[in-house]
Curated annotation (Swiss-Prot):
Its main location: nucleus. It comes from Bos taurus. This is Leucine-rich repeat-containing protein 10. GO terms for biological process: cardiac muscle cell development. InterPro entries: Leu-rich_rpt, Leu-rich_rpt_typical-subtyp, LRR_dom_sf, LRR_domain-containing. Keywords: Leucine-rich repeat, Nucleus, Repeat. Residues 239-278 are annotated as: Disordered. The gene is LRRC10. Residues 239-250 have a biased composition (Basic and acidic residues).
């Protein structure tokens, strides 16, 4: 359904697009997914909030800067994509969607995240890349089930020590930030499998050989004097990594992301909540 909508709205003027989308969505799709990506939306169609068994909602690549409080009716929602919009702050209503597992917030104008985000204790994947973050919000460290964190292309200079509380975290993407040192907290997270610090300003890498779960470290495009030491079998992408020609770090990242997304598609079986009569 989402692809069909995008194909049509590409030819519809922006001032008429909102009305078209509203008319098109008369009832909840059988797959419990609504994809309004690239629909030129300035306002979220409130009547979608009546689809109380909705599981996936994609609002990527629109012009949204707010969401209605009625969104809180979607208590079965597990995936919410708000990337490529105009949000300067995360709408509080998002923090009421307690079954969310995957939240995409990349390519907005976020400078921080609200404390209420800690209410999303089912969150496994959080993407906040390409925002205006100068520090990683400490509330992220309270998301105890988080497995994947993508915070690349911000202005991060360090990571909070509390990050090591996230014992389920397996993948952290920090490319394109302002790190001048390898984040010390990552040295105390032996369960990490993928670390990406590509395109930072790191001059020296400590040994990562003790990180027993590590599978891939991407450290290219840093002014480093050495390659990070890793355990046997760990793949490195960056200067001095191997004697053989090193792979393209972008391809390595895309491969890892594709692998993660295939795993994310297997959402945990959360029981649907009964619809309310409100």
């Amino acid at each position: 359904m989402g692809n069909t909508i995008r194909a049509f709205v590409a030819f519809i003027p922006a001032d008429r697009c909102q009305n078209y989308v509203a008319r098109d969505l008369r009832e909840m799709p059988l797959d419990r997914m609504v994809d309004l990506s690239g629909s030129q939306l300035r306002r979220f169609p409130v009547h979608v909030c009546s689809f109380q068994e909705l599981v996936k909602l994609y609002l990527s690549d629109n012009r949204l800067n707010s969401l209605p409080p009625e969104l809180g009716q979607l208590q079965n929602l597990q995936i919410l994509a708000l990337d490529f919009n105009n949000f300067k702050a995360l709408p509080q209503v998002v923090c009421t969607l307690k079954q969310l597992c995957i939240l995409y917030l990349g390519n907005n104008k976020l400078c921080d995240l609200p404390r209420e985000l800690s209410l999303l204790q089912n969150l496994r994947t959080l993407w906040v890349e390409a925002n205006y973050l100068t520090k990683l919000p400490e509330v992220v460290c309270e998301l105890s089930l988080l497995k994947t964190l993508h915070a690349g292309s911000n202005a991060l200079r360090l990571l909070p020590g509390q990050l090591q509380r996230l014992r389920e975290l397996r993948t952290i993407w920090l490319s394109g930030n302002l790190l001048t040192d390898f984040p010390p907290v990552l040295l105390h997270m032996p369960f990490l499998e993928i670390i990406d610090v590509d395109r930072n300003s790191i001059r020296y890498f400590p040994s990562l050989a003790h990180l027993s779960s590590l599978k891939l470290v991407i450290y290219d495009h840093n002014p480093c004097r050495n390659a990070p030491k890793v355990a046997k079998g760990v793949r490195r992408v960056g200067r001095w990594a191997e004697e053989t020609p090193e792979p393209d770090p972008r391809k390595a990242r895309r491969y890892a992301l594709a692998r993660e997304e295939s795993q994310e598609a297997q959402l945990p079986a959360l029981p649907p909540l009964p619809p309310t009569n409100s």
